[in-house]
């Protein structure tokens, strides 16, 4: 599954990746192998010692113990990414998906792409158009992207589906 996420993000050694919610660092380790630099933002203070232990050999990872919704994402991306657009990768819980993605859009940060793993229901809702009962904030935000913004950046694609047993075991 981690390889599929890295592939979906189109990651290279030249990329700076912003990982939202790295948890104990399992995906972060793989991201550090695929990307040039990884910025891992984790809100849970209790996970930081575990995360740092897991990532002790990953010299290209910076761990930040903050709430992604309260960080100046643009400033962080510009400082850590050297002015180049960053790629965002996250495994988002249902209840926080919309605020995080909206925050990324509204940050003005130089973002190359956003690759997130979300529940099927969220992915389905992200792909509906105007007039659907499920049309919501994320769909609306996609629809008002400036004309100079590449549709490629705004494309919503289901790259792969997670089997039910994997969803349960990852809880």
Question: Model regions: which residues?
Answer:
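Catalytic cores of RNA-modifying enzymes
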Residues: 1-171
């Amino acid at each position: 599954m981690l390889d599929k996420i890295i592939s979906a993000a189109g990651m290279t050694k030249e990329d700076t990746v912003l990982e939202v919610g790295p948890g104990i660092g399992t995906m972060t380790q793989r991201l550090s192998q695929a990307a040039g630099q990884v910025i891992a933002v984790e809100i849970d203070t209790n996970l930081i010692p575990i995360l740092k232990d897991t990532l002790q050999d990953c010299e290209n990872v910076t761990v930040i113990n903050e709430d992604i919704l309260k960080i100046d994402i643009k400033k962080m991306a510009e400082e850590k990414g050297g002015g180049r657009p960053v790629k965002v990768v996250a495994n988002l819980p249902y209840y926080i998906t919309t605020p995080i993605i909206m925050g990324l859009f509204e940050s003005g940060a130089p973002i190359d792409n956003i690759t997130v793993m979300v529940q099927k229901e969220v992915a389905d809702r992200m792909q509906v158009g105007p007039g659907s009962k499920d049309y919501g904030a994320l769909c609306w935000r996609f629809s008002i992207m400036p004309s100079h913004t590449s549709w490629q950046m705004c494309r919503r694609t289901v790259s792969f589906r997670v089997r039910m047993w994997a969803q349960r075991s990852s809880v």
